[in-house]
């Protein structure tokens, strides 16, 4: 039908229709291409959370906490400061150190995470990571990286590392080579001083150095999806005795926080601020 109609048209009208049709088709193709080229983005302001303490546990006041992680029901901790840095397995109920490896005095211990039968610990300015046997704490190997080492966590396929800036780095868990990087932001503002990390149900929880709050980060986009306000959880005495240390126990769906040289470790529950 349309073909018969086109046959009886004059040349000028036919040319005009063909040009318009070509423009519409091209525009449609361009729109499709633009749709596929744009990455999904987060929308809306971050959700605000408050907390309540479920239970309080003792914590070693000589533990300058830099990393905290649960694995198979056991709590592991990395402590910092030159000459005092350590890897520990800690009894949650009474805070006693059940097992410990002291780092050589030239290393400042930092972020910590677990992968299968191994523990991975960062150092601060030395730019070296150590891999340990989870059971014996025997050293299995080491690796290097180009930035400072602050926080470390594992999302099931990649290590995620912070360096005190607004960046998160993704590392291959076998080769420890960097495979990706994102910048963390709240709206358009970068979020800096990102410290200890914990992967919780598809998001990254991050301590922010010298702030009593935790950022909840979308690890695909770097967008801050939420803030947990921990104001008043503990009044520290020293300028460096700040909130640092997040551990999530998947087996019990429990969240724990502590700080550097704090006397307590807290199990907390969070709720949306009204």
Where are these regions (language model features)?
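Short loop/turn segments that connect beta-strands within beta-propeller blades
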Residues: 91-95, 133-137, 173-176, 218-222, ...
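Surface loop/turn motifs at the tips and blade-to-blade linkers of beta-strand repeat domains
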Residues: 56-61, 100-105, 141-147, 182-189, ...
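Signature of short aromatic-glycine-proline-rich micro-motifs recurring in repeat-based ectodomains
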Residues: 65, 194, 239-247
């Amino acid at each position: 039908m349309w073909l018969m109609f086109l046959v009886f048209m004059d040349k000028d009208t036919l040319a005009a229709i063909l040009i318009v049709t070509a423009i519409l088709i091209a525009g449609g193709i361009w729109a499709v291409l633009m749709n596929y080229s744009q990455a999904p983005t987060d929308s809306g302001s971050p959700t605000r959370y408050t907390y309540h303490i479920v239970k309080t546990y003792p914590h070693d006041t000589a533990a300058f906490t830099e990393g905290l992680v649960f694995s198979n029901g056991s709590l592991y901790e990395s402590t910092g400061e030159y000459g005092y840095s350590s890897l520990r397995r800690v009894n949650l109920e009474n805070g006693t150190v059940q097992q410990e490896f002291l780092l050589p005095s030239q290393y400042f211990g930092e972020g910590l995470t677990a992968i299968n039968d191994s523990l991975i610990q960062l150092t601060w300015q030395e730019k070296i990571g150590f891999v340990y046997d989870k059971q014996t704490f025997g050293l299995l190997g080491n690796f290097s990286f180009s930035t400072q080492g602050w926080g470390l966590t594992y999302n099931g396929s990649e290590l995620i590392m912070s360096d005190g800036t607004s960046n998160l780095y993704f590392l291959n868990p076998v080769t420890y080579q960097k495979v990706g990087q994102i910048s963390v932001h709240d709206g358009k503002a970068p979020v800096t001083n990102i410290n200890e990390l914990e992967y919780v149900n598809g998001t990254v929880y991050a301590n922010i150095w010298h702030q009593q709050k935790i950022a909840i980060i979308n690890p695909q986009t770097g967008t801050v999806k939420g803030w947990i306000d921990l104001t008043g959880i503990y009044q520290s005495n020293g300028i460096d005795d700040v909130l640092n240390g997040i551990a999530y126990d998947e087996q019990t769906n429990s969240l724990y926080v502590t700080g550097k040289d704090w006397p307590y470790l807290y199990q907390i529950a969070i709720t949306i601020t009204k």
